[in-house]
């Protein structure tokens, strides 16, 4: 199974369905707890810092576990590694739902480990089985992840309020990994490519010394940083400019929808171009303009939120597509994915608290927002480098 043409029509559909369901699981189990954080904090009398750790802990798990995903896939194969990732997520959901604050944090960390494996391995799997459809399938699963984020946020509060409680609502999220496991069973049974030749395995270990790999990594990594800064602080930024909590919440939801929209458009564009430098720089600059607009013209926050959200979502899709396009093999793609996501999520975990401290020191959001704009300009430069039509050797 080295390319999409070697898959029968039925097997191809089942594989794509499995990929999209795994993508749904990776996002919905991460974002689903966010609307219940205040309820969880009250239930366990957590401090604000402890509550914030529930959001940061998965990001730290992503950063720590991501580099291990490619070696695991070389040892056990991508199919079985993804199956194990889904089992970890199921176990984490069960542990997180038990009545103990310690198990709440422990389960959250386990979920983060499972998500990290899945995040890293999906681009490699797409590179291996759909080498001529990397952009389209990456766009499809990115769009699926965006929709899943909205679904997770929308479903847990009604469940919690209608007899399930917050623990039951979080436990109900197990439906997603269980369905993904069911759809992934055929891939477990047809397990292939469990091992990689020694020379190619050694080749993937040198990924950290490749300038092109670092350009892809920093393009994705800076986007993760600026996205998590804005997604974390946008309501506070808007409220400081006179918006109501309801208005700020609506714009926060609009931001998440805007990040999903490029999944429909970017793959169509990428299908016709081999050199992605122009589009990579353009979407990164959209993020910069959005941040500057929020800083100096907050009255037009809808425009700036849409602009930033579309730019960041498009950057993520481009970055994930670069992983497949710039890697010369499926396992090198997994290694590059692990590198990019490890660095990216480490930056993402540090960004929101750092920008929060800068805000506290200055008393306003101007410096953090201009920091996001400058970082976005730097991201555009790395996009110009990563968008060249060449592979890592």
UniProtKB/Swiss-Prot annotation:
Q: Could you state one GO biological process linked to this protein?
A: response to antibiotic
Under what conditions is it induced?
A: Repressed by NimR.
Please give the superkingdom of this protein's source: Bacteria
| Transmembrane portions of the chain | 13-33, 53-73, 81-101, 102-122, 141-161, 164-184, 219-239, 250-270, 279-299, 305-325, 335-355, 367-387
- The residues on the Cytoplasmic side of the membrane are 1-12, 74-80, 123-140, 185-218, 271-278, 326-334, 388-393
Q: Which PANTHER family match?
A: 2-NITROIMIDAZOLE TRANSPORTER, PTHR23523
Q: What does this protein do?
A: Involved in efflux of 2-nitroimidazole.
The entry's protein name is 2-nitroimidazole transporter
- In its UniProt entry, the species of origin is given as Escherichia coli (strain K12)
Output the lineage of the source organism. Answer: Bacteria, Pseudomonadati, Pseudomonadota, Gammaproteobacteria, Enterobacterales
């Amino acid at each position: 199974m080295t390319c999409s043409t070697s898959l029968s029509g039925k097997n191809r559909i089942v594989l794509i369905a499995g990929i999209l369901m795994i993508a749904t699981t990776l996002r919905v189990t991460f974002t689903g707890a966010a609307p219940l954080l205040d309820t969880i904090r009250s239930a366990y009398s957590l401090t604000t810092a402890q509550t914030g750790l529930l959001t940061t802990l998965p990001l730290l798990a992503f950063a720590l576990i991501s580099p291990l995903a490619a070696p695991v896939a070389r040892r056990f194969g991508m199919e079985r590694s993804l199956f194990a990732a889904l089992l970890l997520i199921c176990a984490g959901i069960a542990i997180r739902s038990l009545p103990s604050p310690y198990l709440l944090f422990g389960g959250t960390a386990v979920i983060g480990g499972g998500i990290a494996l899945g995040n890293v391995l999906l681009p490699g799997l797409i590179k291996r089985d759909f080498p001529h459809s990397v952009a389209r399938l990456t766009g499809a699963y990115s769009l699926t992840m965006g929709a899943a984020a909205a679904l997770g946020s929308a479903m847990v509060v009604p469940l919690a309020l209608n007899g399930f409680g917050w623990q039951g609502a979080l436990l109900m999220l197990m439906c997603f990994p269980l369905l993904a496991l069911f759809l992934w069973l055929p891939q477990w049974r047809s397990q292939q490519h469990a091992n990689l030749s020694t020379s190619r395995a050694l080749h993937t270990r040198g990924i950290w010394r490749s300038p092109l790999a670092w350009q892809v990594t920093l393009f994705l990594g800076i986007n993760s940083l600026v996205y998590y800064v804005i997604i974390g602080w946008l309501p506070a930024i808007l409220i400081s400019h006179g918006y109501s909590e309801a208005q700020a919440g609506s714009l926060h939801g609009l931001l998440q929808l805007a990040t999903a929209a490029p999944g429909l458009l970017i793959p169509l564009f990428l299908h016709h171009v081999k050199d992605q430098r122009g589009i990579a720089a353009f979407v990164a600059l959209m993020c910069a303009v959005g941040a500057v607009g929020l800083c100096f013209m907050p009255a037009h926050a809808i425009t700036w939120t849409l602009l930033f959200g579309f730019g960041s979502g498009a950057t993520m899709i481009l970055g994930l597509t670069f992983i497949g396009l710039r890697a010369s093999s499926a396992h090198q793609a997994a290694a590059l994915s692990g590198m990019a996501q490890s660095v990216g999520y480490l930056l993402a975990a540090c960004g929101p608290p750092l920008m929060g401290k800068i805000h506290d020191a200055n008393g306003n959001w101007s410096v953090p927002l201009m920091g996001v704009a400058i970082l976005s300009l730097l991201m555009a430069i790395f996009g110009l480098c990563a968008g060249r039509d060449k592979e890592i050797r």
